[in-house]
């Protein structure tokens, strides 16, 4: 990172690539401007780039019209400056004719400025121009969610499934035994060079990190002999060989092609016996084995937990077995978590409900509380909201998610955000740069929690914006919005430490209702992970019944876990041990079949915050800069205009000290604005009294 020439080489490599799948004309304008950035010494490290190809002229190139042509885009990406790159995908139909593509590069001298008049309009215009962006009240924009009768019917159909659905939340007591805590060291390292370099990030550094997490108690569901919806647990091996073993993954049994998914995928095991244990000894140890190749594959930044020492792995498994032996002796008389959640929802609307649910939350006041907590730049022991307020937020968000389809169809303009991972300060920076809702429409691609230090504030603020602007603010599901992943990577521990286990269960129940994918303007397919070999129709996503957990294999699993690859194989098992990798052929087939121009996904750390793949037919967006405080990556947000002009707004990586300074400045602005508002209100009150 920090090597601008390497970056140019990477971007130029796409310019003269041959085309298997001709795409529409693409034009791009680039705006560069300088922004202060706090970069660590890591920025001097060089990065790997895509295979080099002949350099492209910066002037317009008109290729031979007799041959299919690709967008010829050159990006001069200098690491010391933040800039916006724009790519134009015409709103015309997906054409595969041999048309000419012209490169339009128009440098602009505009500098970084906070949007002024348009963002600063408000219901009450008094001193609106003096308010910081986080305090401005605006009229919501027109809804961008396209609705139709079929999606409404599906939503109604989904809500009726709650009586037969077993939520994937643990049934731990709030005072879990600390004896079940297991500490072990996980090694973060690079993978072998077997993966193609074009999809690995160059800002790779080997690091060691002590990760302490609590292993789950074996809870049990209450048995119901009249229902047959429990799934038999999948027995898995703890050996490394299990990651190489695969089973057929099929959305339907009539498919012509069978693909395989490794057994150690992150699905949830449920038993048909009366104990109904959520995590069995096998499934728990399998989860631990799976964590060795979890969220971000070693082909990019290997920040996932490669346990290289076999004896260390054996010790972990032995400890897991001891924990499970203890847990097997615990009898849990709790009722089904779904019934518990339904009881909460019923009590919230009942006249005889407890006092704590009688007073509905003020969503505007709640948002301001969360913003104040963020700008305070202090991680407090407790959340700024009460537990009953958190429950109400989850209940309201859950209802909205279920009222909207699993496959969102959105109209531009919209800003698309990748992984956030509990980096609350960076989320506030993102909103400051791109506009606080509702000044901009947003689509988040998932992974809101885990790894970061303020996952609760992050997900609560996003839920609050969803509640306030349900037709302009959208959240997709990521692979971290799942019970067993959050149990290992931090969100469970944070909920238990700062709230209680019931709060965590309620979040999991809400995660189970999140939509899975979105289509922008009928041309951009947005998803957290990627494609699936069993996806034959968009209706298969539309008709997914929610709430649902993340299964071991199949469509939902693939949408949340799959990754692109340069492999010659169209589909192959993923090195994560979960789902698949898909190559350029699979991407081109997908685009041709459904008439899309671009796949926009997240799920991977990329050094520049965004990274194109397969001649710009797929883009990875990652929005957590300085990820985990260990990697010097940038964060990015992809903005899609009404004319399908795609631009990228970048967040430079800040260390904790620099981030605190940014939050301090925001806190001072908010404090000053509050004082001015109070003075104005006092003045108005005095004037009214004097007139009377």
Curated annotation (Swiss-Prot):
Residues at the active site: 480 (proton donor)
CC per GO annotation: cytoplasm; nucleus
Biased composition (Acidic residues): 170-179
One Pfam family cited in the UniProt record for this chain: STPPase_N
Residue numbers carrying Phosphothreonine: 171, 261
Gene3D superfamilies documented for this protein: 3.60.21.10
Co-factor note (free text): Binds 2 manganese ions per subunit.
Renumbered residue ranges of the record's region Disordered: 1-309, 321-357, 672-692
Assembly behavior: Interacts with SIS2 and VHS3, which regulate its activity.
Note: Present with 217 molecules/cell in log phase SD medium.
Protein name (Swiss-Prot/TrEMBL): Serine/threonine-protein phosphatase PP-Z1
């Amino acid at each position: 990172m920090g090597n601008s020439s390497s970056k140019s080489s990477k971007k130029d490599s796409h310019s003269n690539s041959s085309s298997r799948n001709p795409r529409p004309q693409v034009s791009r304008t680039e705006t560069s401007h300088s922004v202060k950035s706090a970069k660590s010494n890591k920025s001097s490290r060089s990065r790997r780039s895509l295979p080099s190809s002949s350099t492209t002229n910066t002037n317009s190139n008109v290729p031979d019209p007799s041959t299919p042509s690709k967008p010829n885009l050159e990006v001069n990406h200098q690491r010391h400056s933040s800039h916006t790159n724009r790519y134009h995908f015409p709103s015309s139909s997906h054409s595969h004719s041999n048309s000419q593509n012209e490169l339009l590069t128009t440098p602009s001298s505009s500098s970084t400025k906070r949007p002024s008049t348009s963002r600063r309009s408000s219901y009450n215009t008094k001193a609106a121009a003096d308010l910081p962006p986080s305090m401005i009240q605006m009229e919501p924009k027109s809804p961008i969610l396209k609705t139709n009768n079929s999606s409404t019917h599906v939503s109604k159909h989904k809500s009726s499934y709650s009586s037969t659905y077993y939520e994937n939340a643990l049934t731990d007591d709030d005072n879990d035994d600390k004896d079940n805590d297991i500490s072990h060291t996980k090694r973060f390292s690079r993978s072998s060079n077997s993966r193609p370099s074009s999809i690995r990030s160059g800002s790779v550094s080997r690091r060691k990190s002590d990760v302490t997490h609590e292993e789950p108690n074996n809870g049990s569901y209450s048995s119901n002999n009249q229902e047959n919806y429990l799934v038999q647990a999948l027995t898995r091996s703890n050996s490394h060989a299990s990651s190489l073993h695969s089973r057929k993954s099929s959305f339907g049994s009539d498919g012509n092609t069978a693909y395989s998914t490794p057994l150690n995928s992150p699905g949830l095991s449920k038993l048909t016996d009366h104990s109904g244990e959520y995590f069995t000894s096998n499934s728990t140890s399998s989860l631990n084995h799976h964590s060795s190749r979890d969220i971000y594959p070693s082909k990019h930044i290997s920040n996932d937990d490669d346990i290289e020492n076999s004896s260390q792995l054996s010790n972990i498994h032995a400890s897991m077995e001891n924990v499970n032996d203890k847990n097997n002796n615990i009898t849990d008389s709790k009722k089904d978590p779904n019934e518990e959640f339904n009881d909460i929802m019923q009590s919230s609307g009942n006249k005889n409900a407890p006092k704590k649910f009688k007073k509905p939350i003020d969503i505007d006041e709640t948002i301001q509380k969360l913003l104040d907590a963020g700008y305070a730049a202090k991680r407090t022991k407790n959340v700024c909201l009460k537990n009953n307020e958190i429950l109400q937020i989850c209940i309201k968000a859950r209802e909205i998610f279920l009222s909207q389809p699993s496959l969102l169809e959105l109209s531009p303009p919209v800003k698309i955000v990748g992984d956030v991972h509990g980096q609350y300060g960076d989320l506030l920076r993102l909103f400051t740069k791109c506009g606080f809702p509702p000044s901009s429409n947003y689509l988040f691609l998932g992974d809101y929690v885990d790894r970061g230090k303020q996952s609760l504030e992050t997900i609560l603020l996003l839920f609050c914006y969803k509640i306030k602007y349900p037709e302009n603010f959208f959240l997709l599901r990521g692979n971290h919005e799942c019970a067993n992943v959050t149990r290992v990577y931090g969100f469970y521990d944070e909920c238990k430490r700062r709230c209680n286990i019931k709060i965590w269960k309620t979040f999991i129940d809400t995660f189970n209702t999140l939509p899975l994918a979105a289509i922008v303007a009928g041309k951009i397919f947005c998803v957290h992970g990627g494609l699936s070999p069993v996806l034959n129709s968009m209706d298969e996503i539309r008709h997914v019944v929610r709430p649902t957990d993340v299964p071991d294999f199949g469509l939902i699993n693939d949408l949340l876990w799959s990754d692109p690859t340069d492999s010659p194989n169209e589909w192959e098992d993923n090195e994560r041990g979960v789902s698949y990798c898909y190559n350029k052929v699979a991407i081109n087939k997908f685009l041709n079949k459904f008439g899309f121009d671009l796949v926009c996904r997240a799920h991977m750390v990329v050094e520049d915050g965004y990274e194109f793949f397969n001649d710009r037919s797929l883009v990875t967006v990652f929005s957590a800069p300085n990820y985990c405080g260990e990697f010097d990556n940038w964060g990015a947000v992809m903005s899609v205009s009404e004319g399908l002009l795609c631009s990228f707004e970048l967040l430079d990586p800040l260390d904790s000290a620099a981030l605190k300074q940014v939050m301090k400045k925001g806190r001072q602005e908010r404090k000053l604005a509050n004082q001015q508002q109070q003075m104005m209100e006092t003045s108005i009150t005095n004037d009214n009294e004097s007139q009377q």
